[in-house]
Amino acid sequence: MNGVIVGKLDGKVAVITGATSGMALAGAKLFVDEGAHVFITGRRKDELDQAVELIGRNVTGVQGDSADLDDLDRLFDTVKREKGAIDVLWASAGTGEPRRHHEITEEHFDAAFGLNARGTLFTVQKALPLFNDGGSIIMTGSNASQRGYPGWSVYAASKAVQQGYARVWAAELKDRGIRVNVLTPGQVATAKQEELFDEATKRQFESLIPRGKMGRAEEIATVALFLASDDSSYVNGIELVADGGTTAI
């Protein structure tokens, strides 16, 4: 043995959308630590630049909105020009704001479905021509589509479609050996959570979690690494829930 430690994604090329904060940023850092070159996206240039600086190496930032097909074309043109192929795609860009049924507007509906459903679909579609056979596609779901949290109907519905995507695409891509799975987190302590929920609401959420606490972004990142790597070589077409047991009881 030569003592060289090989990372789980050594030499791989990964694309992670919406990776300027939270779980996806933690995942990008972990993927790089495990040997990948990672392309990350974000809508705001200042946040994207900060994320690239934080990751520090083997990372390319591409500004863009995953709901904008022109931006997606520019993303994958950059990947093709710089690396030529993709091994891992984590379609993590998403959006959601709470609205009770009587508060839902067309704009609210279109924003959620435009990014979470439409954006995810076209992200995967436009990535596939660059995919190496045997690669891994991960989509970020939400346990809101299973738990029925009041006020989250549009968000829950826009995330539930990804389970259908995963099942069908796993079948469609079987001849290329490309796996497609959904990573579904529950409540995770991120800046977005701080923005959306007050302390009382967060304590209420924590009371529903058998693990007794919100997850950390780094904990979800390790699940993404599992799905991205050969550790999950026989895992395909599923929804892997990492929510501390919330949906299990």
Regions found by a protein language model. Name each.
Residues 90, 174, 179, 235-237:
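Short, small/polar-rich loop/turn modules that mediate ligand/substrate recognition or access, typified
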Residues 142:
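Residue(s) in the substrate-gating loop at a strand-loop-helix junction
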Residues 129, 171-175, 233:
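Alpha-helical segment proximal to the catalytic Tyr-Lys
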Residues 130, 214-242, 247-248:
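C-terminal substrate-recognition "lid" of short-chain dehydrogenase/reductases
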Residues 124, 158, 166:
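Active-site helix of classical SDR
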Residues 100-101, 105-113, 193, 205:
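Substrate-binding pocket helix/loop in short-chain dehydrogenase/reductase
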Residues 13, 20-21:
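Conserved glycine-rich cofactor-binding loop
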